[in-house]
């Protein structure tokens, strides 16, 4: 009998897949002592004496029989019995030299070595492993399972960290696809009567959905696996901001109308939102897409039944300005006394009313979509207020009435001009006003040519808006440099021209008084009093942060906001959302006005300009005309001026300890 070549495990062989034709290699985890290799067999001698002796004691000679297979080496245990039976049942027939494996045999671990020499099986040896070896094999198997499970959990946790959300990339791609399908299904089930409207609505909604998808993708992709403070986070989030802002610009430019207005609102929040958004969306403050004269003609036919040339003399075909909701044409109007004057004709974009509600629904959907992936972004409630405001702006008759009311409130002010309305040429979608020549308030070069004193102009400008907020409680709520022109009065004083009166907000009397006290206390750096009135206004536990959003001191607004972000960390957006959501809606528009005032203050290089408004807020506290109220006003104003001078003196002597008005910011 030829020498029996056997392969024996040191402590048992676990989970090794048998090879049928050639055994050419073995796993690195099994310790073999290689003594001899021929062209057909792999032979090794195990040094485990206990197992070797056991084999010698239990030899079982098998009859010689021709086989059609190569040597088979395996371990019978509960993990590979079924695998072995499945793989080898039909190989080599049912030769008696193959060790039978009972299906239910899981109580003992056995090893079978089937050895072949020159296509003849010489022996087959079956043995039972010692108990300690068997236990070690089973223990090793269990440890392997535990390690595999632990690795799997670590991989899942790593994937979750990379996604930055409960949603994986696959998840939000699925949501995007389902959103498109849902939108298409709705249009199929309930299509508009006019097929053109179907195409328009479908395309506009797809643009919104696509923009929302891109914005979400940019942030998920560039911030994947990064947390605030990590290396590369600042650089990557700037890239994401820039790309997301471009996606918004593309969307607003394509959909026009309401979307341009939303872009203007976003561009005005420059002390809250990233500068990448502000720079990109500011283009819509002055340059919005306009419609052709043919569209204007159609609107005139619908509104008046006439052609523009039948109503005006020399109606210019190209608009001199285009905004979010309308464009302005210059024309000449012949009055009843045959006087010919220049007028500005504001024409609403055709179809805007029909698109209004659909566009608001689309914006609501995309904000909800973004909120799924960024839970801290909870600003969709703003759309409700925006919807109310925009419905007012779309009514030009309402705008005309607002302008006349504003003129009455400032009837004694010789340095404020409001264009006259020509009612006979005005409808809900066409507004005809006096044309006034002037220079934009942010045009420094133009103001210098006029010889305007910038400090005097700033005090005029801030006082007019302070009176609207603190005294009259009737606020022009769409202020931006394009709506403010400057010209000279006959005596050389600056004359402020206020345009676009479509959106005004009536401020509740109690809100107005509380806001007056809040502003005064912020100017004095009185943290306790300012927090008291901020709570009354609805800021709640975040009352101490409201002053930062008001940014009374432009030179400190960015620094104060950075301090707030450091304190709140990743909760900054959540806190801002809670403050804005719970404040009276009038205050939201006050914040927008404050942004403009801050911009002009910075542009003109005015220091402590907020103090001028503080004096007006004191006047708002004492609005009565009786002698007692007037005495209280002058006494309070005198005390206020003294306090400001004392604080300013201390600030100059000890600048690190006292700041105006950010003295309260160390409480944040």
From Swiss-Prot:
GO MF: ATP binding; protein serine/threonine kinase activity
Biased composition (Basic and acidic residues): 138-162
Positions that bind ATP: 320-328, 346
Region of interest (Disordered), residue spans: 88-111, 132-162
Skewed-composition ranges (Polar residues): 91-105
Family of the protein in this entry: Belongs to the protein kinase superfamily. ADCK protein kinase family.
Keywords: ATP-binding, Coiled coil, Kinase, Nucleotide-binding, Serine/threonine-protein kinase, Transferase
Stretches of the chain forming a coiled coil according to its record: 131-163
Transmembrane segments: none
Organism this protein belongs to: Dictyostelium discoideum
Active site residues per record: 478 (proton acceptor)
Residue stretches making up the Protein kinase domain: 314-668
Broad enzyme group: transferase
Listed name of the protein: Probable serine/threonine-protein kinase abkB
EC number: 2.7.11.-
SUPFAM superfamilies: Protein kinase-like (PK-like)
Keyword Coiled coil applies: yes
Superkingdom, natural source: Eukaryota
């Amino acid at each position: 009998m030829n020498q029996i070549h056997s392969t024996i495990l040191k402590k048992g062989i676990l989970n090794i897949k048998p090879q049928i034709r050639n055994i050419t290699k073995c796993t690195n985890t099994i310790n073999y002592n290689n003594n001899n290799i021929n062209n057909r067999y792999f032979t090794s001698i195990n040094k485990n004496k206990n197992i070797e002796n056991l084999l010698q004691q239990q030899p079982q000679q098998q009859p010689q029989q021709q086989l059609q297979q190569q040597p088979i080496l395996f371990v019978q245990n509960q993990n590979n019995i079924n695998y072995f039976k499945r793989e080898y049942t039909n190989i080599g027939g049912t030769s008696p030299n193959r060790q039978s494996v009972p299906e239910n045999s899981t109580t003992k671990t056995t090893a079978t070595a089937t050895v072949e020499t020159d296509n003849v099986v010489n022996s087959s040896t079956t043995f039972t492993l010692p108990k300690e070896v068997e236990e070690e094999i089973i223990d090793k198997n269990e440890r392997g399972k535990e390690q595999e499970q632990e690795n799997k959990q670590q991989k899942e946790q790593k994937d979750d960290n990379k996604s930055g959300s409960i949603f994986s990339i696959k998840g939000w791609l699925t949501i995007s696809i389902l959103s498109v399908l849902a939108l298409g299904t709705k249009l199929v089930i309930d299509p508009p009567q006019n097929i053109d409207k179907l195409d328009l609505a479908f395309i506009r909604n797809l643009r919104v959905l696509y923009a929302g998808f891109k914005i979400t993708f940019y942030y998920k992709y560039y911030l994947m696996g990064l947390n605030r403070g990590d290396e590369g986070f600042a650089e990557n989030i700037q890239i994401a901001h820039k790309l997301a802002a471009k996606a918004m610009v593309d969307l607003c430019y394509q959909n026009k109308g309401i979307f341009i207005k939303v872009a203007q609102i976003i561009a005005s929040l420059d002390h809250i939102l990233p500068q990448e958004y502000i720079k990109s969306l500011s283009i819509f403050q002055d340059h919005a897409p306009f419609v052709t004269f043919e569209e204007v003609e159609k609107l005139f036919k619908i509104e008046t039944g006439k052609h523009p040339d039948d109503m005006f003399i020399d109606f210019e075909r190209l608009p001199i300005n285009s905004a979010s909701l309308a464009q302005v044409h210059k024309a000449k109007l012949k009055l009843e006394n045959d006087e010919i004057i220049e007028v500005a004709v504001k024409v609403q974009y055709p179809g805007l009313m029909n698109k209004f509600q659909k566009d608001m629904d689309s914006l609501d959907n995309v904000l909800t979509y973004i909120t799924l992936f960024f839970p801290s972004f909870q600003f969709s409630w703003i759309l409700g207020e925006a919807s109310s405001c925009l419905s007012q702006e779309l009514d030009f008759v309402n705008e005309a009435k607002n302008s006349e009311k504003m003129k009455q409130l400032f009837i004694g002010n010789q340095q404020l001009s409001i264009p006259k309305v020509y009612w006979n040429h005005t409808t809900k979608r066409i507004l005809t006003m006096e044309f006034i020549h002037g220079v934009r308030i942010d045009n420094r070069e133009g103001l210098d040519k006029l010889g305007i004193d910038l400090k005097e102009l700033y005090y005029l400008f801030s006082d007019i808006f302070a009176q609207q907020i603190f005294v009259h409680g009737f606020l022009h709520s769409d202020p931006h440099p394009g709506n403010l022109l400057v010209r000279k009065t006959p005596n050389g004083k600056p004359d402020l021209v206020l345009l676009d009166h479509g959106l005004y907000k009536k401020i509740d009397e109690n809100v107005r008084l509380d806001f007056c006290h809040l502003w005064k206390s912020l100017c004095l750096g009185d943290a306790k009093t300012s927090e008291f009135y901020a709570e009354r206004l609805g800021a709640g536990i975040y009352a101490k942060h409201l002053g930062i959003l008001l940014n009374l001191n432009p030179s400190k607004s960015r620094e104060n906001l950075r301090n707030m972000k450091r304190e709140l960390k990743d909760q900054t957006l959540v806190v801002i959302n809670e403050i804005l959501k719970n404040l009276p809606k009038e205050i939201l528009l006050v914040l927008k006005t404050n942004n403009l005032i801050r911009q002009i203050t910075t542009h003109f290089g005015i220091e402590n300009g907020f103090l001028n408004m503080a004096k007006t807020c004191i006047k708002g506290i004492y609005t009565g005309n009786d002698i007692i109220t007037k005495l209280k006003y002058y006494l309070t104003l005198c005390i206020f001026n003294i306090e400001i001078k004392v604080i300013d003196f201390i600030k100059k002597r000890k600048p690190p300890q006292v700041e105006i008005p950010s003295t309260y910011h160390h409480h944040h």
